[in-house]
């Protein structure tokens, strides 16, 4: 199998050892509607503790990041979001994502991994913690991404692909070329 395709193991699915081919190069080259950071300090990860009233992942842990604006690259989005949410961004963020998240075949986010050497963030009243990768409070999507670093995280739980597409159509980058491309058909 060439560099253009990589065999990806779907994690935590009820069907044991389900495998599929995904064009990882195409996924990585595509503009994702969200950019997120996997920020680590030693063996701990910086996580946003989402409030009980949060619209997404209420009461769960998530990586920091957010929606990409039109005309922004994924890295520009990430730096902007980290500065907005933490008052800080790492000096060095690799150009290549550590992981990309596909949900129901659609690209949702690129996740970039970087180190953090501080804990004095300006979080606008939001809580944060340094936690283990295996912390049970991680949101389902973020737990999947942490487990799949270096590959593509696929999240198919038998949900409605139309709902995922509807989510994509609500972000600022809606309508951009390729945003509604499916990288595989859920089984």
Regions found by a protein language model. Give the residues of each.
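Classical eukaryotic N-terminal signal peptides for Sec-dependent ER targeting/secretion
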Residues: 1-8
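Active-site-adjacent beta-strand/loop module that shapes the phosphate/pyrophosphate-binding cleft
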Residues: 32, 41-43, 99-134, 144-151, ...
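Charged phosphate-binding loop/patch that engages nucleotide di/tri-phosphates or the phosphate backbone
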Residues: 143-187
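N-terminal strand-loop-strand
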Residues: 21-62, 90
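N-terminal chloroplast transit peptides
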Residues: 9-12, 16-19
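The catalytic Nudix box helix
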Residues: 64-98
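Short histidine/acidic/glycine/proline-rich micro-motifs that form metal-
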Residues: 67-69, 102, 137
């Amino acid at each position: 199998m060439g560099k253009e395709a990589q065999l990806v193991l779907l994690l935590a699915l009820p069907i044991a050892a389900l495998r599929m081919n995904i064009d990882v190069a195409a996924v990585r080259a595509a503009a994702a509607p969200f950019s997120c950071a996997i920020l680590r300090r030693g063996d701990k990860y910086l996580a946003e503790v989402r409030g009980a009233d949060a619209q997404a992942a209420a009461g769960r842990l998530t990586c920091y990041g957010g929606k990409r604006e039109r005309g922004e690259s994924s890295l520009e989005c990430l730096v902007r979001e980290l500065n907005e949410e933490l008052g800080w961004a790492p000096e060095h963020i690799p150009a290549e994502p550590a992981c990309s998240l596909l949900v129901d075949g659609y690209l949702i986010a690129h996740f970039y991994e970087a180190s953090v050497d501080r804990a004095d963030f300006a979080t606008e009243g939001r809580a944060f913690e340094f936690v283990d990768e295996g912390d049970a409070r991680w949101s389902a999507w973020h737990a999947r991404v942490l487990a799949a670093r270096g590959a593509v995280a696929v999240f198919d739980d038998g949900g409605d692909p139309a709902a995922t597409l509807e989510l994509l159509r609500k972000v600022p980058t809606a309508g951009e070329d390729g945003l509604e491309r499916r990288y595989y058909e859920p089984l």
